[in-house]
Curated annotation (Swiss-Prot):
GO terms for cellular component: extracellular region. Keywords: Carbohydrate metabolism, Glycosidase, Hydrolase, Polysaccharide degradation, Secreted, Signal, Xylan degradation. It comes from Aspergillus clavatus (strain ATCC 1007 / CBS 513.65 / DSM 816 / NCTC 3887 / NRRL 1 / QM 1276 / 107). It catalyses: Endohydrolysis of (1->4)-beta-D-xylosidic linkages in xylans. This is Probable endo-1,4-beta-xylanase B. The active site is at E117, E208. It comes from the Eukaryota. Its EC number is 3.2.1.8. GO terms for molecular function: endo-1,4-beta-xylanase activity. Disulfide bonds: none annotated. One of its GO terms (biological process) is xylan catabolic process. The gene is xlnB. Endo-1,4-beta-xylanase involved in the hydrolysis of xylan, a major structural heterogeneous polysaccharide found in plant biomass representing the second most abundant polysaccharide in the biosphere, after cellulose. Residues 33-221 form the GH11 domain.
Length: 221
């Protein structure tokens, strides 16, 4: 996922009794709602919204670390708020996530030199992202057990364009949507398993969907 070589901002149509076209609330909501890939900073947080432009996906920046995303019959998207540059910080989050099909809630990000895409998966929908991957170990953190995996993407979209790169995973065995994620615990466990991160690029509390529908409203700090 995630190639930002050609980004565009599109304001989507918003309809509803509480946000009628021409109303102040309508105009304010439209300013923050995205339907095409974009990154930026809003209310002190970095945000990243990437979509392959298949199906219907809309992302809305809320106040502070809050965001919402709605999707219907999507291809693939990843959306969320966090930090750029990232660090081994402790992430606290809460939210309401209602997927129908394949979707994840994760602490998600990238490093460079080497180019690594990483996930700390808190919950997933109909598909376990570790399916077919070899388990490299486990890490106990924040009241749960996470299984560690490594996978490879070949000629796939990345923050550096189409590249071949590794993906590092921690997948929580007991699902949750809300709590604290001590990322340092995962990064240290990955290193002990021979998984070397590079220099941090960005890291977000992400909602991802793949050929699915759903909605999510999340807040991160």
């Amino acid at each position: 996922m995630v190639s930002f070589s050609s980004l565009a901002l599109a304001l989507s149509t918003v309809v509803g009794v509480l946000a009628a076209p021409g109303s102040e609330k309508y105009v304010e909501l439209a300013k923050h709602q995205l339907t095409h890939s974009q990154t930026g900073t809003k209310n002190g947080y970095y945000y990243s919204f990437w979509t392959d432009n298949r199906g219907q996906v809309s992302y809305t920046n809320g106040k502070g670390g809050q965001y919402s995303v709605n999707w219907k019959d999507c291809g693939n998207f990843v959306a969320g708020k966090g930090w750029n540059p990232a660090s081994a910080k402790t992430v606290t989050y809460s939210g309401n996530w209602k997927p129908s099909g394949n979707s994840y809630v994760s602490v998600y990000g990238w490093t460079q030199n080497p180019l690594i895409e990483f996930y700390i998966v808190e919950s997933f929908g109909s598909y376990n992202p570790s399916t077919g991957a070899t388990e490299l170990g486990t890490v106990e953190s924040d009241g749960g057990t996470y299984k560690i995996y490594k996978t490879k993407r070949v000629d796939a979209p990345s923050i550096e364009g189409k590249k071949t790169f590794d993906q590092f995973w921690s997948v929580r065995t007991s699902h949750r949507v809300g709590g604290t994620v001590t990322t340092k615990n995962h990064f240290n466990a990955w290193a002990k398993s021979g998984l070397k991160l590079g220099t941090f690029n960005y890291m977000i509390l992400a909602t991802e969907g793949y050929h699915s529908s759903g909605s999510a409203t999340m807040t991160v700090s």
